[in-house]
Amino acid sequence: MTRFADWLETTPAWLIGLILVAAMFGASLLGEWLKRRTSTAKGDDEEGGREGYIVSATLGLLALLMGFTFSLAVDRFEARRLLVLEEANAIGTTYLRTQMLEPVDRARISKMLVDYTDNRILLAKAPLDQIPALLAKNDQMLTDLWTATLAAWPSIKGLDFSSSYLETMNNMIDLDSARKAARLARVPSAVFFVLFVYVITSAGVLGYAGANKEGRGATAFLFLLLAISLLLTLDIDRPRSGRITESQAPMERLRATLASQPPEVFDRMSAPKATATPAAPP
């Protein structure tokens, strides 16, 4: 099953679609051939009625299985989409609270958060061959962020917001793990394998029931619809290589906000530091 999962992940969707349609046509022709070999002149009407029930039941079960698989894929897609928004909010909150640190720590961590946001956006859109390097850079950035937080801790540990700042930074780091887990949470490959087998078997049942006699054009159209439905489900379940992926708009809006709000922006309402006035000579 691991090989099948790898094949689903690495094979282009259009090629999977061609193979699936060809397999359905082959199964349909095989079913038609078996029908001719086993059919008898007597009792055709009664047998045709039984075949109609079998075809209806087969297609009904196929619709149920495809709907179940599509629901699994959409649920996982929605979870990934919500995590993007949560992470953008967490990074933004951390950035704002960073402005309360000492100037040196504030400048350093603010710059690191901007770079981290850039890398997160690249990581979500990168092709498969670039992901390992970006992941390694991502993990190193998180280590550096926590190291910088520890360096800033002595200057804030006595302040009221120190605990909430640590909590915010921890939450941001935890969301990195949550997004990684969400991208690995896929529809089990065994479900897709059973679905592929069932689709091909259903095509064979249709061929045996004489669907090809009604016109191969209609049969081809049905097979095309089934293949498109299955490929849509498969594409939604491909967070790295699919065309339908979770939007990075929250992260991109955050990046634009960070670019427009460097640390110096937050100093414009601060009271100027009082300068010592030299004492008048006696």
Annotate each predicted stretch with a short phrase:
Residues 84-100, 247-261:
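Short extracytoplasmic/periplasmic juxtamembrane "stem" segments immediately C-terminal to an N-terminal membrane anchor
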Residues 280-282:
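Short, solvent-exposed mixed-charge patches
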